[in-house]
Swiss-Prot record:
Keyword Repeat: yes
Stated family: Belongs to the PPR family. P subfamily.
Organism phylogeny: Eukaryota, Viridiplantae, Streptophyta, Embryophyta, Tracheophyta
PPR-type repeats, residues: 165-199, 202-232, 238-268, 272-306, 307-341, 342-376, 377-411, 412-446, 450-484, 485-519
Protein name listed in UniProt: Pentatricopeptide repeat-containing protein At3g22670, mitochondrial
Organism superkingdom: Eukaryota
Keyword annotations: Mitochondrion, Repeat, Transit peptide
Signal peptide from the UniProt entry: none
Length: 562
């Protein structure tokens, strides 16, 4: 449980007996940085501190000048020594780190943006030993660039002593599906199926296929893949497989197709409790509460008892509508039926109350949790930190963050992402960078940075025109196998446009287009308008030409978003 020193003082203003009883909360609007975070955080290198403060460094006469000297990293052939030479000299680090195989491969993959056939030819000069772990790492780094990923995949399979496994095939299938190259995706699945002895096509393979089809709005294709997978690939169409399909359809906003599958297969594939919970969640998500209730009644008729997952779907939907009266009624109904809310339920309620600016009630949720003997988890902490930060209580948020391990709860990537966003929201740029550095020291993969980790940091760099720090962060992303996706390009293009860095925005736009990611509509218009304002006619024509040529080649580009 959380210590009284940390949590109890937060709810001492309220101490509600019912979680929705209205009280006032006295907020702490201090801007003081948490001494706990400051004391335990690792020291930042001077070259990052200089970028944040715009002070001259000991090894550079003008950081601001360097900060303007921006060259977009190609995300692979970045010359590390060029960018980090000052750090190496100042720290006396004269020993060069050997170039890792992953970096050698990435150097080749980013030499030019060409077809996957050309990538295969280029890699013929690459002298690395191919292993399964190397293949998986490369596919993670290029999960948004199917040409490079697929070219490397083909080349790797031709190397002496190496044969692709089911894991690497599935990873490549997922990349192709993510990039919506479905024809090539199916070719690869059929290639996997030729190896009858190994049985490479599994439910994991087909689940990735169905999920990617559903995500692209190809709901009928996803259903067809399920119906054909036993006959064509020997993958059993059982309850688990049906649930995988229905879950994909519901998550991608098609409860109608999921319900249709359920009705069609009801007599041939026996549903289980998860089947009903998927449908109930889908109906609640679509605000079809009568249908959700009817499904819960059918669940009971088929001798399955509604559980905490069932009720939490209703709670979440009512929370999103801001109908806390019905939320309270649902919580009471749960208890009457012998089903206590769990930490997921309480986290949803607390987060929604905080979002509705009912902060006293939100913090009061913890008291109710204690009554039920419910122990907070990492997601609960993340929500609590977010609420405290948004209400000006950043010092409390930082203390709660630091106290997590004392309470036996490990910080994960979601908690770090929330804390980084909170630090930046309160102009604690240096603390945010410390947190990013601390993530590397956490054990396990649960704290590996993801796109959401970097997004607010990149946004800060654009807003404050920290061009060199922006480059360092992009490099850091690649080193952590975080693929630059279309959303990141949009963030960069729009952020740089708003900061007057139009030339840099053009560079990112060009790179996105070369990789098949075309930010259309509002993003493109913003860039063109900014170029027009600055009388950059030549650059404007180039951007318009890029978009038009790409549109002609692929008028239905699956990666085009606004």
């Amino acid at each position: 449980m959380l210590t009284k020193l940390r949590i109890s003082k937060l709810v001492s203003y309220t101490l509600p007996r019912r979680i929705f009883q209205r009280r006032f909360l006295v907020t702490n609007n201090t801007a003081e940085e948490s001494p706990i975070v400051a004391a335990e955080s690792p020291e930042l290198p001077s070259w990052i501190k200089d970028f944040l403060s715009n002070k001259p460094s000991s090894s550079s006469s003008s950081v601001s000048k360097d900060d303007e000297d921006f060259v977009i990293p190609s995300l692979a052939n970045w010359v590390e020594s060029q960018k980090f030479s000052r750090q190496q000299v100042s720290e006396g680090n004269v020993v060069k780190k050997p170039v890792e195989d992953i970096d050698k491969v990435c150097d080749f993959l980013n030499k030019k943006d060409t077809s996957h056939e050309d990538v295969v030819k280029e890699l013929s000069k690459c002298d690395v030993v191919v292993t399964e772990s190397l293949v998986l790492q490369v596919l993670r780094r290029f999960s948004n660039g199917w040409n490079q990923a697929y070219g490397f995949f083909i080349w790797a399979n031709s190397q002496t002593g190496y044969v692709h496994s089911g894991h690497t095939y599935n990873a490549m299938v997922d990349v192709l599906g993510k990039c919506r190259n479905f024809d090539l995706m199916w070719e690869l699945v059929n290639e996997m199926n030729k190896n009858e002895e190994s049985k490479l096509v599994t439910l994991d393979t087909m689940s990735k296929v169905m999920r990617r089809l559903a995500k692209s709005g190809k709901y009928n294709k996803a259903v067809d893949a399920f119906l054909e997978m036993e006959k064509s690939y020997g993958v059993k169409t059982d309850t688990i497989a049906m649930n995988s399909l229905m879950d994909a359809l519901v998550k991608e906003n098609s409860i109608e197709h999921a319900h249709e599958v359920f009705l069609k297969l009801f007599d041939t594939i026996k549903p289980d409790a998860r089947t009903f919970n998927i449908l109930i969640h889908g109906f609640c998500k679509a605000r079809k509460f009568d249908d959700a209730r009817a499904m819960m009644d059918l669940m009971k008729v088929t001798e399955f008892t509604p559980d905490v997952v069932t009720y939490t779907s209703f709670v979440e939907a009512y929370c999103k509508e801001g109908d806390f009266r019905r939320v309270n009624e649902m919580l009471e109904e749960m208890r009457e039926n012998g089903c206590n809310p769990n930490v997921v339920t309480y986290t949803i309620v607390m987060h929604s109350l905080g979002k509705s600016k009912q902060v006293a009630e939100a913090l009061g949720v913890y008291e109710k949790m204690k009554e039920d003997g419910c122990v907070p988890d990492a997601k609960f902490y993340s929500s609590l930190i977010h609420i405290l930060s948004k209400t000006g209580r950043f010092k409390d948020a930082a203390e709660i963050f630091e106290d997590m391990t004392n309470q036996g709860v490990r910080r994960d990537v979601l908690v770090y992402n929330t804390m980084i966003s909170a630090a930046l929201h309160h102009s604690r740029d240096e603390m945010a960078l410390r947190l990013l550095k601390r993530m590397e020291d956490e054990e396990g993969e649960s704290c590996s940075p993801n796109v959401e980790t970097y997004a607010p940091l990149l946004k800060m760099c654009c807003h404050k025109k920290k061009m060199k720090l922006l480059g360092i962060l992009l490099h850091h992303m690649v080193k952590n196998d975080v693929s630059i996706d279309v959303s990141t390009y949009i963030l960069l293009i729009r952020g740089l446009c708003m900061s007057g860095k139009v030339e840099e925005a053009c560079l990112f736009f060009e790179e996105a287009v070369r990789k098949g990611m075309v930010p259309r509509d509002s993003t493109c218009k913003m860039l063109v308008d900014e170029l027009e304002k600055k009388n950059m006619a030549e650059a404007k024509l180039k951007i318009q030409s890029l978009v038009q040529s790409k549109t002609m080649i692929d008028s239905h580009s699956p990666l085009s978003v606004s």
